[in-house]
Amino acid sequence: DHHHSTDEPSESSKPCCDECACTKSIPPQCRCTDVRLNSCHSACSSCVCTFSIPAQCVCVDMKDFCYAPCKSSHDD
């Protein structure tokens, strides 16, 4: 059965974003436009998914910063 551990999140579940768009306002309004399969990153509070299989999900949270890029952790 699925249960969420209360331990420190692993490296892979830390919020990260490769495609991040910010406005030029102060403070900036930033939104991560990464498309992920079946879920959004761990810190996302507003996750919007398509009804396809697998679902394509985008986090629509507005932040005043961008998360660290995901790519750096696993280079091909």
From Swiss-Prot:
SMART domains: BowB. The record marks F51, S52 as: Reactive bond for chymotrypsin. One of its GO terms (molecular function) is serine-type endopeptidase inhibitor activity. PROSITE patterns: BOWMAN_BIRK. It comes from the Eukaryota. Disulfide bonds join C16-C70, C17-C32, C20-C66, C22-C30, C40-C47, C44-C59, C49-C57. Pfam families: Bowman-Birk_leg. The record marks K24, S25 as: Reactive bond for trypsin. GO terms for cellular component: extracellular region. Keywords: Disulfide bond, Protease inhibitor, Serine protease inhibitor. Belongs to the Bowman-Birk serine protease inhibitor family. This is Bowman-Birk type proteinase inhibitor DE-3. It comes from Macrotyloma axillare (Perennial horse gram). The lineage of its organism: Eukaryota, Viridiplantae, Streptophyta, Embryophyta, Tracheophyta.
